[in-house]
């Protein structure tokens, strides 16, 4: 049983989540969403627990109904320079900065917050407990999955559309056989090993 979340007192709450910390390739993508209480969205949940079809339908509904939404990202070279944690925090800051309405409270999935110019609170399992974070997780996941499908067209031998860049056995085998693309994260151990050969 997931513990229900008690919302802080605030006028405009943004939810923030990230997708893509674990993959060996591509950007880490974040989203920030301020929902409109007058236009509720039914069925918001952690993006990982939704079917792709449901995620896509909710993505369109969130984009249409949210008071404000924004995407942020950190590219592979930034991940390599900063490390994945700091790059994720930077991408979250970018998502919040991109909102055209400034929230007075930001709820962030996980156990730590980036430095922000407004109040913020980390919420463990927030993508299952907080509607705004669920919405952000859906926007971030759909966006990153689409990017991996695009990358798959550019590099069809790696299987990016299937594994989304995560270190599956197939991805590791392709990496060993073909080498790293320019989009691979060079600081991640499996990529580093291939580059050292």
Curated annotation (Swiss-Prot):
CDD domains: RNase_HII_bacteria_HII_like (cd07182). GO terms for biological process: DNA replication, removal of RNA primer; mismatch repair. PANTHER family: RIBONUCLEASE H2 SUBUNIT A (PTHR10954), RIBONUCLEASE HII (PTHR10954:SF18). PROSITE patterns: RNASE_H_2. Its EC number is 3.1.26.4. It catalyses: Endonucleolytic cleavage to 5'-phosphomonoester. Keywords: Cytoplasm, Endonuclease, Hydrolase, Manganese, Metal-binding, Nuclease. It comes from Serratia proteamaculans (strain 568). This is Ribonuclease HII. The keyword DNA damage does not apply. Residues 11-197 form the RNase H type-2 domain. A divalent metal cation binds at residues 17-18, 109. Transmembrane segments: none annotated. Belongs to the RNase HII family. It is found in: Cytoplasm. The keyword Cytoplasm applies. Gene3D superfamilies: Ribonuclease H-like superfamily/Ribonuclease H.
């Amino acid at each position: 049983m997931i513990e229900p979340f008690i919302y802080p007192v605030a006028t405009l709450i943004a939810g923030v989540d990230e997708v893509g910390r674990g993959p060996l390739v591509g950007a880490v993508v974040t989203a920030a969403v301020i929902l409109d209480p007058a236009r509720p969205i039914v069925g918001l949940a952690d993006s990982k627990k939704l079917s792709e079809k449901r995620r896509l339908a909710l993505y369109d509904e969130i984009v249409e109904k949210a008071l404000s939404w924004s995407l942020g990202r950190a590219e592979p070279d930034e991940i390599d320079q900063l490390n994945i944690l700091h790059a994720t925090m930077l991408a979250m800051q970018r998502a919040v900065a991109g909102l055209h309405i400034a929230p007075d409270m930001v709820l962030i999935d996980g156990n730590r917050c980036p430095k922000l110019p407004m109040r913020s609170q980390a919420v463990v399992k927030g993508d299952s407990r907080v509607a705004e974070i669920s919405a952000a997780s859906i926007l971030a996941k759909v966006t990153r999955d689409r990017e991996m499908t695009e990358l798959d067209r550019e590099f069809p031998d790696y299987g990016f559309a299937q594994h989304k860049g995560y270190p599956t056995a197939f991805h590791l085998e392709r990496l060993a056989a073909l080498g790293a693309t320019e989009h691979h994260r060079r600081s991640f151990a499996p990529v580093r090993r291939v580059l050292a050969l």
